A protein has these predicted regions:
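Helix-start/capping segments and mature chain N-termini
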Residues: 1-159
Length: 159
């Protein structure tokens, strides 16, 4: 971790191609849909990745094996809505709450396709254990780390 609390080297991730997470009333509970996460984590390790992204039944990205995903494009912050099948994570909720009181960090919920991911300026993953983790690379795309660090600082001040 660097002095701002985010990971210094950045994560290397990719999209797990072999399973889709269904969207249903249990989608937001990780324990009810754990098999795609386990398979994706094994695949990530076999491919020397830090994490893998999970696709939903519509081939859109919903989250990673252990975290919610956020992306930044043109200084706007986005995350998939819960109806895309992502886990209702504690840190995701905190960042959305922070966004309601801090206009510098407004977050919009939007679908995340593979194309949108590869056009993003920044990507970060969040969970309650590891906090905010900057994604450095997905496939051949290299991401910046500026706004994500500011969000970590703002979040750290609320704790």
């Amino acid at each position: 971790m660097d002095q701002k609390g985010t990971n210094e080297n950045g994560l290397i991730i990719d999209i797990f191609p072999d399973a889709r997470k269904s969207i249903d009333v249990f989608s937001n509970l990780k324990s009810a849909n754990y098999l795609p996460y386990v398979m994706a984590a094994i695949w990530a390790k076999e491919n020397r990745l830090n994490d893998a992204l999970i696709l939903n039944q519509h081939d859109r990205i919903c989250d990673s094996t252990i975290a919610n995903i956020f992306w930044i494009k043109d200084k706007k912050i986005f995350t998939p809505p819960l109806n895309e099948g992502c886990v209702a994570g504690v840190m995701r909720k905190k960042i959305l709450e922070l966004a309601t009181v801090n206009s510098d960090h407004l977050v919009q919920e939007a679908i995340l396709t593979q194309e949108i991911l590869l056009q993003a300026d920044e990507v970060f993953l969040t969970n309650a254990v590891t906090g905010i983790r900057w994604v450095k690379e997905c496939r051949d795309k290299i991401y910046k780390k500026t706004i994500g660090s500011k969000i970590f600082t703002a979040l750290d001040q609320t704790i």
